[in-house]
Amino acid sequence: MQFLDDSLLPENQEKLVITVAPYGPEWEPADFPEDIPVTMEAQVQKAVDCYNAGATVLHLHVRELDGKGSKRLSKFNELIAGVRAAVPDMIIQVGGSISFSPEDDGAAAKWLSDDTRHMLADLDPKPDQVTIAVSTIQMNVMEILSESDVAGTSFNRPAVANAYREMTVPAGPGWVEEHLRRLQKAGIQPHFQLANIAHLETVERMVRRGVYTGPLNLTWVALGGGFDGPSPYNMMEFVRRVPDGACLTLETLMRNVLPVNAMAMAMGLHPRCGIEDTLWGRKGEKMGSVQQIEQLVRIARELGREVASGKEAREIYKIGTSYRDADDTLAHLGWAPNRAHGQRGVPLRRAA
């Protein structure tokens, strides 16, 4: 992404799109009973409260009445329908793992099977987005967590901690390409969750081959444990490599969330918050998803950055848009065109 002399001025930046992940499938309700919704009614109301606070993208997982993460797509359909009726302008982004939480102590923390995750393209009503990983990778979320991060939570139990230490993301090339085909056919926009620059390069290669032809909404996911860590050096190199036509959100864990989000907002990028990412405000003080959104809105106001409405967020994300082919997609995203047969030198960009 390019930064001009006036790129840090808020009047030249996109309006702020706040993503919230308020369902926290990794946590047990007892970890934060004041903020973890369990009933379907409470889960819908949580979306409403987050939208009213200023979040316009809802990262959605679902819980069963016993408090465990739901692996039933019928429950996803029910929650999507409830949220759509209550806050129709909110962008509904379904977490592509469905649920990675272990069933019981000693069970693995794992994503559901390839075929089951493909069924996200058949959700009804359909969401606006489904998140997608583009490479199989270790997802050891325990690696950068401190004792204070997990104090008083289920992550203090060795079996739970070990399950998340050993978690991997299954996303082989064949599955990724088939998943993108199904999502695009269904009119659902993929939201790429990328762990590092290697994953960004994989996305670019898929665009160049015409595997994906649409707007590029990305999240840089700085979790450590196989992913980039939340170092500003990692962040800035990733930002540098993202094409100008993409929309970039930053994500990390626990008390790194606020400083990373503050940098995102100052640079004209977009933040993500919510209890899936952090339970904490100041050290030792829990902060719920709505309060995290309100904090970001306050910071945005101090920066002079306007917060997008639901309809404006849909325009920024280009929900419902697709492009003709690889060349058209490359032009819209600001990547150099594919090399023509026999062409030497650097292919020059053209206007979209």
Predicted regions and their residues:
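Glycine-rich, proline-tolerant flexible connector loops at the mouths of alpha/beta enzymes
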Residues: 56-77, 220-224, 279-283
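Conserved, mostly hydrophobic/aromatic
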Residues: 43, 50, 61, 130, ...
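Active-site beta->alpha loop and helix N-cap motifs at the rims of alpha/beta catalytic domains
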Residues: 41, 76-170
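Active-site mouth loops of central-metabolism enzymes
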Residues: 22-45, 96-113, 165-170, 191, ...
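Alpha-helix-loop-beta-strand connector modules within alpha/beta enzyme cores
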Residues: 68-96, 179, 183-185, 237-245, ...
